[in-house]
From Swiss-Prot:
InterPro entries: Metalloenz_LuxS/M16, Pept_M16_N, Peptidase_M16, Peptidase_M16_C. Its main location: periplasm. GO terms for molecular function: metal ion binding; metallopeptidase activity. Disulfide bonds: none annotated. This is Protein YhjJ. The gene is yhjJ. Belongs to the peptidase M16 family. It comes from Escherichia coli (strain K12). SUPFAM superfamilies: LuxS/MPP-like metallohydrolase (SSF63411). Has lost the active site residues. One of its GO terms (cellular component) is periplasmic space. Residues 1-24 form the signal peptide. Keywords: Hydrolase, Metalloprotease, Periplasm, Protease, Signal, Zinc. GO terms for biological process: proteolysis; response to hydrogen peroxide.
Length: 498
């Protein structure tokens, strides 16, 4: 779903998610992914993985609708419809349906069977390998759930009395930071976790289902060691008979720009104070090579910054401080944060330490030896590209494809990725990287403090004063803001928070 991010694969080697955008001019899709569109508009994508014969077969059905499509009176419809679907047998007999769901969840990495968000509804199945019977049943079930659902007062009541297996993104839509981030956005008042309003009117839910659950708004993805021709034939037979066409475009979710202010938010999401130095920019799809190279440069600059600050803190023997970086795309906004984990009574001094290093990098740049070491490391990682690809299991491959879809990024072949990445690393200079660092560190930044509930509210004015005193614009610093497509979240070499 939105906002998800990928970290390092295979001992530090970034792989398929970034392998998404390479090729001079327009980027060409990876031919390993077979794809097509049925006559009713449903899109399908299949990746066969003979190199992973023992992996599970991953299936996702993405429906381009969520809670943002609801009016006030329709609140809860987008969550209720998949709940109804999960309590029906989907054209199978009851025993088959039970068996499908018992085997259709990966015990090692369980996913909710359905995730509803503001603009999407995602059905998830993970099947044992070499079970063509289950694959056929899964496709039949999904087609039935998304095109032939029985919606009556009885089926609604049955669903509401059953355990709610439908998850939302974000998982906690009422969490304090998320509510703060929604201010001024089109998403307010469209909570995907909202319950149905009483009295429940079955006909109106059915009308909503028929309006938004149309095949031309669906994308089916299959990844695994399967016979592609057989799977495509099955998709044609099973989904080709679905009816309906979108008459109304789906509303587009957007977030307002992040306000550059200092705020404290009480939340159950943290056990220790976490201060985020945060900035965001508009997100642009990546479909051509110039955007890819800008992204790579900005991403490498962020990684260099992370390691520089981390090493500076280690050299100063700083204790009681944890450092992390975090970048992601949230509804057309590319958001990055430098996260400081700190005891409450050391927040001011720890922010002072980090801000001084950031100002130093902004004004003087990175030392050339740090730049050379980072580029050498990246070249070494690139040599292990195909080994990492071989180790990427079907769950990872599917997750990366989903992120590329949602952020409108073109996936290309690993061979093309390797060539362009090599050319990029060979042509990069310390001056180019330092220019990017100046741009990013010259953004107006927000100070977002997450505090455990019950803790006294911190004096954010004092924290802002610490920041302003150190980070006041320097005459040596560039004043240009970061380019709009310099930030892409799911494909970062920055390691997770320590």
């Amino acid at each position: 779903m939105q906002g998800t991010k990928i970290r390092l694969l295979a001992g530090g080697l970034l792989m398929m998610a970034t392998a998404g955008y390479v090729q001079a001019d327009a980027l060409q899709p990876d031919p390993a992914w077979q794809q097509g569109t049925l006559s009713n508009g449903l899109q399908w994508q299949v990746l066969t993985t003979p190199q992973r014969p023992s992996d599970r077969v991953e299936i996702r059905l993405l429906v381009n609708t969520g809670s943002l499509a609801e009016s006030t009176q329709q609140s809860g419809y987008s969550h209720a419809i998949p709940r109804i679907a999960l309590t029906q047998s989907g054209g199978l007999d009851a025993a088959q349906a039970r068996s499908l769901w018992q085997q259709g969840i990966d015990p090692k990495r369980p996913m909710p069977p359905v995730i509803v968000s503001y603009d999407t509804t995602l059905f998830n199945l993970s099947l044992p390998n070499n079970r063509n019977d289950l694959l056929k049943e899964a496709l039949s079930y999904l087609a039935n759930a998304t095109g032939k659902l029985t919606i009556t007062p009885e089926t609604i009541n049955h669903a509401l009395q059953s355990q709610d297996m439908v998850a939302t993104w974000p998982a906690d839509t009422k969490e304090g930071w998320w509510r703060y981030r929604l201010k001024g956005s089109t998403l307010l008042g469209h909570d995907p976790a909202d319950p149905l309003k009483q009295p429940v009117e079955a006909e109106k839910i059915k009308d909503f289902y028929q309006k938004w659950y149309t095949p031309d708004a669906m994308t089916l993805l299959v990844v695994g060691n399967v016979d592609a021709r057989s799977v495509v034939d099955q998709i044609n037979k099973t989904f080709g008979e679905l009816k309906g066409k979108r008459e109304t475009p789906a509303p587009v979710p957007t977030l307002s720009p992040l306000r550059a202010e200092a705020v404290s938010i009480m939340t159950d999401a943290v056990r220790q104070d976490r201060l985020s130095i945060m900035w965001d920019t508009p997100w642009q799809p990546i479909r051509e090579s110039a955007a890819l190279l800008r992204y790579w440069r900005a991403d490498l600059a962020r990684e260099a910054l992370f390691w520089h600050v981390q090493q500076a803190l280690s050299a100063s023997n700083s204790k009681d401080i944890g450092l992390g970086f975090d970048c992601r795309v949230l509804y057309l906004r590319a958001q990055c944060a430098i996260n400081i984990e700190s005891p409450n009574d050391k927040l001011n001094s720890n922010l002072n330490l980090v801000a001084r290093e950031l100002a130093k990098v902004r004004d003087k740049g990175l030392p050339e030896e740090e730049f050379n070491a980072l580029v050498a490391q990246k070249k070494l990682e690139l040599q292990k590209l195909f080994a990492a690809y071989a180790r990427a299991d079907t769950d990872i491959l599917m997750g990366q494809r989903m992120r590329s879809l949602q952020n409108q990024v073109v996936d290309i072949a690993p061979e093309q990725y390797q060539k362009l990445r090599q050319d990029f690393l060979n042509s990069l200079t310390v001056e180019m990287l330092n220019q990017d660092l100046r741009q990013q560190l010259s953004n107006d930044m927000a100070l977002i403090l997450l505090q455990p509930k019950g803790e006294p509210e911190f004096n954010m004015k004092a924290l802002q004063a610490v920041w302003d005193q150190i980070m006041a614009p320097s005459t040596a610093a560039a004043t240009t803001s970061v380019a709009t497509d310099d930030v892409h979240p799911e494909v970062t070499d920055i390691p997770p928070a320590q």
